[in-house]
């Protein structure tokens, strides 16, 4: 299995501004943390949530509360807080993977609710390689984020109205399989009936793995659903250890 992990220097200003734009969501999250702090003693295991440390068992619901609050404004918020730079990062990320080069590819985009990465994958395959068979299954734990993805694809050439799975299917005049579908699911525990072993050529997760409670569980599931020799690709913020690169 090939491994692509694209990391970028942590942008403290970006994160601070982003946090400032979500006061209501984070106030709700802080109240939730306060209400459930008593559970920490029961397990003793903690994990990060933004700039806080919270009990492991509470992180999933806290993340859901935040994204429920910002789903309709998520893409606009990313544009405002990164001055549009997040689009360049995502373009570079997808371009480096060359989806469609070996058509058709079966892809899974996890934590990809609004369809940002899925749309780029399909556009790249079509525009660079005239590939209209590559497909993407978008998975997200948050139904409201998936709903935003539906809205986005309704404005594209990939949309048609016949439903599939739990959310939506879209395609490009294909008589066989649809090119994109949206599914509610947990990256740490993908349904083995729906997401079968050794199925996908490409697994992507962009700015999502930090929101997962157990990264090892996410990686284990990614390994399970990917074909032998397939590609795992993660786009995420990180600190650069090499002082020459971080200067």
Predicted feature locations:
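N-terminal auxiliary segments of SAM/dcSAM-dependent transferases
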Residues: 23-26, 33-65
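Conserved alpha-helix/loop element of class I SAM-dependent methyltransferases that forms part
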Residues: 73, 83-106, 120-124
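Class I SAM-dependent methyltransferase SAM/SAH-binding core
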Residues: 105-192
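Short beta->alpha hinge that forms the Motif I/post-I loop of the SAM-binding pocket
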Residues: 140-141, 214, 237
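A short acidic, Gly/Pro-enriched loop at the edge of an enzyme's catalytic core
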Residues: 188-203
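A short SAM/SAH-binding and catalytic strip from SAM-dependent methyltransferases
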Residues: 201-215
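A short glycine-rich, Lys/Arg-flanked "PGG" loop and its adjoining helix->strand segment in the class I
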Residues: 216-228
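Conserved class I S-adenosyl-L-methionine
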Residues: 231-247
